[in-house]
UniProtKB/Swiss-Prot annotation:
Swiss-Prot/TrEMBL catalytic activity: molybdate(out) + ATP + H2O = molybdate(in) + ADP + phosphate + H(+)
Keywords: ATP-binding, Cell inner membrane, Cell membrane, Membrane, Molybdenum, Nucleotide-binding, Translocase, Transport
Domain Mop span(s) in chain numbering: 289-355
Example GO molecular function: ABC-type molybdate transporter activity
Domain of life where this protein originates: Bacteria
Protein name: Molybdenum import ATP-binding protein ModC
Membrane topology note: Peripheral membrane protein
Lineage of source species: Bacteria, Pseudomonadati, Pseudomonadota, Alphaproteobacteria, Hyphomicrobiales
Residues involved in ATP binding: G32, H33, S34, G35, A36, G37, K38, T39
Broad class of enzyme this protein falls into: translocase
Role according to the record: Part of the ABC transporter complex ModABC involved in molybdenum import. Responsible for energy coupling to the transport system.
Subunit comment: The complex is composed of two ATP-binding proteins (ModC), two transmembrane proteins (ModB) and a solute-binding protein (ModA).
Encoding gene, per UniProt annotation: modC
Domain ABC transporter stretches: 1-233
Source organism (scientific name): Brucella melitensis biotype 1 (strain ATCC 23456 / CCUG 17765 / NCTC 10094 / 16M)
Amino acid sequence: MSGLTVSIRGRNGAFAIEAGFAAEGGVTALFGHSGAGKTTLLKMIAGTLRPENGRIAVGDFTLFDAQKGINLPPEKRRIGYVFQDARLFAYMSVKRNLTYARWAGHRQATRSFDEVVALLGIGHLLDRRPSTLSGGERQRVAIGRALLSDPALLLLDEPLSSLDHARRQEILPFIERLRDESHVPIVYVSHEIDEVARLADQIVLLSAGRVTASGAAADIFPLIDAESEGGGVLLEGIVSAYDERYKLAEIDLGGASFQLSDAGLKQTMHVRLRVRARDVSIARKIPEAISIRNLLPVTVTGIERGEGPNAHVFLDFRGRRLGARLTRRSVDDLGLSVGDQVVALVKAVSVDRAAIREK
């Protein structure tokens, strides 16, 4: 088994969908506004809604192929599905909910019960009923149940949408462990930018039932940033040094570095940083005596002027895209044009703690 390949067209009532993308593994986020077609696409992958034509496969395991007449029923697709609500059996203990998945899957186990329980940190919950669990605990059990069915693919349909912020922060580290340690490809549906920034290896953008862009998270995230106040770009780096006196970590981005105030980072740790366009300023040259620590040499690659007071300036940093949201007046005052060599000033707060992850 390997990654997921989707190339389909179909309908859900009057709603038409046309989707094509390939995901190599890890977490593939389906991102779009409400009504974009995320859940419809997930249902077609799961087999509960039939496309009109096309093909869906996980590696060399074909789930649907209209031309060859293949349309496996949901129970034959080896897919673990986690919904917005946990959908646990209320009359069963947590342990029985988990073991039921193994029995219902009718497949030889590739992961031990104890391994899954340890991965999700639910050992202390085994004798409890779902009604006594918090929302985050119920979702962790639901993920464990899906994983114990020995899936070739996991589908997570907005699994955190019913949780408050505290419960989301509680469960996100376990989903990260699932991504990093289970080796099962995951399709993650969300309209929350923060979750996508933290979890996704690949992003598929959906709008009105069509895939508008897909690819590596670092490449696709700037497209979200250009349209959203909450977007940004993702930069991967490694902690190259740590200053104990000032509690500052230095992140090597390959030819440049960021300083990040975070006592939890350790040397040689691989991290992902998120930089929002609203937190990036531009200078013609490196300013003197400035409190901002993170300065990057960049090239202006594009300027998009809206009808309002703001403009979005597209920047290139050693082959990686950045963005800066400036006023149109600032763009004119700086005399910015495509090809200019300038300096991006990144405020310390724009390095999002929630977007940092250990690889």
